[in-house]
Amino acid sequence: MAEPHEIDPIHQFHIDRIIPLHFLGTDVSFTNAAFFMLVIVALASLVLLAGTRNHSLVPGRLQSIAEVSYEFIASTLQLSSGRDGMRFFPFVFSIFMFVFLANLIGLVPYTFTVTSQIAVTFGLAMIVIGTVVIYGLIKHGTHFLGIFAPSGVSPLLLPFMIMIEVISFISRPISLSIRLFANMLAGHITLKVMGGFVAGLLGAGSVYALVAPLPLAMVVIFTAFELLVAFLQAYVFTILTCVYLNDAVHPGH
């Protein structure tokens, strides 16, 4: 019987240096994570440019992808933040495309899932919250701080409500980043373990290979499920971004 091949489900999340770089004593190396982030940006740009270059009454595949993506994000943003929120469309659309493609590319063998890194997801979440705070203060001034003081609250309870709202606001980037990070991490680990189990059965030969088709079918089904999760997590991240942006656009609502 063949020796079982050890498969480490965590190794796929290891960050490797491609080009070692140091600046003022700080490691700023170009890594596999940075490489695949560039790939994601390039891929999104190519698809959208190709899809919007030549318009036709009967759209091709790339034009259909571009149009459906545009309409989907535009309707989501308008429903969450109203017409005034449409000024954030380029920002929200970029967030959705980046997260969705990052999730999808991570399912391709020998690639890297950048959204499985808490530093990446937390960075995205901080960009969202930072945009909300900066725009809210510039547009509404101190009136923006009214989001921490709900109207109609008794003056006796107001200090407690302000404290609760502040804690809730501070926790937004934490929950936003952990939700995406944890789902991508757990899904890819499970997929790797299941794939390793199937490979082990096939490599063992004899009677073990006869039962391999069952777990193999489960891997195929779980991969399809992960494709759905890739979209759902991008959608959840996007819809929450729209909801948070609504605080900056309409701080009194």
UniProtKB/Swiss-Prot annotation:
Cellular component per GO, a single term: proton-transporting ATP synthase complex
Domain of life according to the entry: Bacteria
CDD domains: ATP-synt_Fo_a_6 (cd00310)
Gene Ontology molecular function terms on file: proton-transporting ATP synthase activity, rotational mechanism
Membrane-spanning ranges: 30-50, 88-108, 118-138, 144-164, 184-204, 211-231
InterPro entries according to UniProt: ATP_synth_F0_asu (IPR000568), ATP_synth_F0_asu_AS (IPR023011), ATP_synth_F0_asu_bact/mt (IPR045083), F0_ATP_A_sf (IPR035908)
Major localization listed first in the record, in broad terms: membrane
Subcellular location: Cell inner membrane
Signal peptide positions (record): none
Annotated keywords: ATP synthesis, Cell inner membrane, Cell membrane, CF(0), Hydrogen ion transport, Ion transport, Membrane, Transmembrane, Transmembrane helix, Transport
Function: Key component of the proton channel; it plays a direct role in the translocation of protons across the membrane.
Similarity field: Belongs to the ATPase A chain family.
Quaternary structure and interacting proteins, as annotated: F-type ATPases have 2 components, CF(1) - the catalytic core - and CF(0) - the membrane proton channel. CF(1) has five subunits: alpha(3), beta(3), gamma(1), delta(1), epsilon(1). CF(0) has three main subunits: a(1), b(2) and c(9-12). The alpha and beta chains form an alternating ring which encloses part of the gamma chain. CF(1) is attached to CF(0) by a central stalk formed by the gamma and epsilon chains, while a peripheral stalk is formed by the delta and b chains.
Listed name of the protein: ATP synthase subunit a
Source organism of this protein record: Beijerinckia indica subsp. indica (strain ATCC 9039 / DSM 1715 / NCIMB 8712)
Taxonomic lineage from the root: Bacteria, Pseudomonadati, Pseudomonadota, Alphaproteobacteria, Hyphomicrobiales
Name of the coding gene: atpB
